[in-house]
Amino acid sequence: MPLQTLAENEIIATLLALALLLLSAYSLGTLMEKIKAPRVVGEITGGILLGGTLLYRFFPDLMSGIFMAYEGEGKVLNIFCQMGLVFLMFLSGYNTKIEADRNNAKTIGLVFTGATILPMAAAVPFVSMFKGYFAGESGDIISFMLVFLIGIAITSIPVISKIFFDMGIMNTRFANTVLTVSTFQDLCLWILLNAATRIAEKGEVKLSDMLLVAGFTLGLFVLAKFVSMHAHKFRKKIPAITFFSVSFILLLTVCAVLSYFGINIMYAAFLVGYLVKSFVGDESGSDAKKRMDSLADFAFSFFVPVYFALVGIKLNLVNDFSLVRFVLFFALAFGLEGLGTLLFVSFTKLKRTTKINFAITMNARGGPGIVLATVAYSYKIINLEFFTVLILTTMLSSLIAGYWLRHVQKKDGSIFTEL
């Protein structure tokens, strides 16, 4: 079968572009970690510096010679970008635990309602105000509204987990509550995002179609949850090469097959990760856990940084950005989620500082916020300005959450263990 290949100079240009993306993402990511900030913020910033905000603005010929050296280089790089998204969601699915602590059920329910349902409902009147500035070429109001509302309420499990781990509070009641709520929240929001992309793709809105897509998407997760409850019976030791090969075959095949049924790659990869955990387990010290950790180390040192850097390189904070509209959206998103959480946790007997901690922590958008922006932009649901606003909102909210929690810990180290 004759397949078209890249010329040697095109391969070299692609490798150079990847190396520069990795170098920039690694350098800025490491810098952010040194100042106790989320690494993802640095990796995106590394991409921003390469793009129209700085280097491409002042050295267009040089940067074009690297990232646009031949026709179609952007498409080649986009493959690595998509693989970063796939592995990010695959690993997120593997690390997802849908288990509610019965002793803490009231707090979990109140935080979920205050951080998800209330802010999304309160944001509905603002959709029309921003639509004229933020809507994409698809022009579908329902898809845009769903993305807008998700952007208001989304929370990041990976970023929050990393912050908790670095602070040494990963197994506290506060951390467990936040992670449980974030898991349920992200599941609901992924379902809504999948519905939004499906509606945008079909170009028309029918209530029956919306219900069908939402039902099918939710049904897939229910099926995955059902399988996970019984899959442990079939666990057995398998060689590492078989483990990885079967996992990758399953991952790529399911992503391809489900796309024909209107399920986007992001959600499909999440489901596969969840299923793999069900069959192989995630017990600490087990062979499966060690293998997934090694896969995570590789993915988060190559594909994921490239993904975040390519997200950043698209941003142009000089031409495609309004500071006023960014401030308005950020204040709306941070304020509604924070106040909503604070309002509902006021019905508990938690300490005042703990209530504020929940309100600020649930605002950390991190990786899921980036995924939301890139998926919505790729389906033309949002334009470049809103894409930029969502990315910057994600970065700033994650920084605020991280620094706030460390500030509180310095004042009272026991605040997270005693709810």
Sequence positions of predicted segments:
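Transmembrane alpha-helical segments of multi-pass membrane transport proteins and ion-pumping complexes
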Residues: 21-30, 48, 52, 56-57, ...
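Membrane-interface helix termini and inter-helical loops of multi-pass transporters
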Residues: 2-7, 60-72, 130-139, 198-210, ...
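Membrane-interface junctions of multi-pass transporters
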Residues: 50-103, 230-239, 246-328
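Membrane-interface alpha-helices at helix entry/exit sites of multi-pass transporters
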Residues: 104-110, 170-185, 205-210, 285-290, ...
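Transmembrane alpha-helices that form the ion-translocation and gating core
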Residues: 27-34, 98-167, 311-413
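Cytoplasmic-side transmembrane-helix entry/capping segments in multi-pass membrane proteins
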Residues: 37-46, 103-118, 173-180, 235-246, ...
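Structural signature of hydrophobic alpha-helical transmembrane segments
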Residues: 7-20, 72-89, 139-155, 208-220, ...
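Hydrophobic alpha-helical transmembrane segments in multi-pass integral membrane proteins
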Residues: 55-59, 120-128, 186-197, 251-265, ...
